[in-house]
């Protein structure tokens, strides 16, 4: 099944503590979750690892967010949108449902 949201897509957060924020998708996990740049930041207590040169302390990092809690951003309308699929020239492409423009 093709992914409606992919890496480097710009998304809007629909629910949670970062609701309304816009950011790019850094990673898509196979569990149906996404890691979005600067969204859902959590503080992780990191042990020092001198072999890898990692300092210890409290580190802020992005936690995964459920894919259903984000929507792809449509730059033409400036709003959140839904994605559909269609075939053009024998290739499967993604398009925005509101205005039928192709997702870049």
From Swiss-Prot:
GO annotation terms (biological process):
translation
Q: Does the keyword Cytoplasm apply?
A: no
Pfam families cross-referenced by the UniProt entry: KOW (PF00467), ribosomal_L24 (PF17136)
Q: Does the keyword GTP-binding apply?
A: no
- Keywords for this protein: Ribonucleoprotein, Ribosomal protein, RNA-binding, rRNA-binding
> Which SUPFAM superfamilies does this chain map to?
Translation proteins SH3-like domain
Q: Which domain of life is it from?
A: Bacteria
GO terms of molecular function:
rRNA binding; structural constituent of ribosome
Question: Can you list the GO cellular component terms from the UniProt entry?
Answer: ribonucleoprotein complex; ribosome
- What does the protein in this record do? One of two assembly initiator proteins, it binds directly to the 5'-end of the 23S rRNA, where it nucleates assembly of the 50S subunit. One of the proteins that surrounds the polypeptide exit tunnel on the outside of the subunit.
* Family note: Belongs to the universal ribosomal protein uL24 family.
Q: How does it assemble?
A: Part of the 50S ribosomal subunit.
Q: What is this protein called?
A: Large ribosomal subunit protein uL24
The record's gene field reads rplX
